[in-house]
Regions:
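Exported/periplasmic ABC-transporter solute-binding proteins
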Residues: 1-186
């Protein structure tokens, strides 16, 4: 069963409202301002259509920039990084390519740090991270944009008597400060 955290259930509405706090951002990042095909694809991601793809795949949208109109950019771009962002990015690429058939988008799955490093080094056009960017990454010239939020439900066995815990309790469990349910219940 999923626990309430600080009195809030793990729902899309509560994550959007900020009352359920256990969530992480799905970020994309570019070195400087995106241009051409990369910019057009990012515009798609942040459009009504792109944010619908995000919601249809179980993530929390970030609002949109309105309806999408492609600028007709062609060529090839590389999107690289987080294995957590990859499944929804695959769906975004598929939907975008249905609109812009002349776009070639290569998706490289790795991890957030590798994606951000590739974007800083110019070996990919768009990096993906399932976390906030580190200071060193923004200082390295990356501009990030949150495309979705990923809520993380805290789940316990159905026989566990707990129905709720505080965000401090969750932190204590994952940092090892507490190791038994008796310690959490205090």
């Amino acid at each position: 069963k999923a626990l309430k955290i600080d009195g809030a259930e793990a729902t899309a509405e509560n994550i959007k409202a900020g009352t359920y706090k256990i969530a992480r951002p799905f970020n994309i990042a570019t070195k400087g301002d995106a241009t051409g095909l990369a910019a057009d694809f990012i515009n798609y991601i942040m459009s009504d259509e792109g944010q619908k793809v995000i919601e249809d795949n179980g993530y929390i949208s970030q609002g949109s920039n309105g309806a999408f109109t492609s600028d007709g950019s062609t060529g090839k771009i590389v999107v690289a990084g987080s294995s957590s962002v990859t499944p929804v990015m695959e769906k975004l690429i598929e939907a975008y390519k249905a609109i812009n058939k002349d776009a070639e988008i290569e998706l490289q799955e790795s991890d957030s740090t590798t994606g951000m490093t590739a974007a800083m080094e110019g070996t990919c056009d768009i990096g993906m991270a399932s976390r906030e960017l580190k200071d060193s990454e923004t200082e390295g010239g990356l501009t990030a944009q949150v495309i979705a939020m990923d809520g993380i439900a805290v789940v316990v066995n159905n026989s566990n008597p707990m129905d709720e815990m505080s965000s401090d309790n969750v932190k204590d469990i994952f940092t090892g400060a507490v190791t038994t349910w008796d310690e959490v219940a205090k």
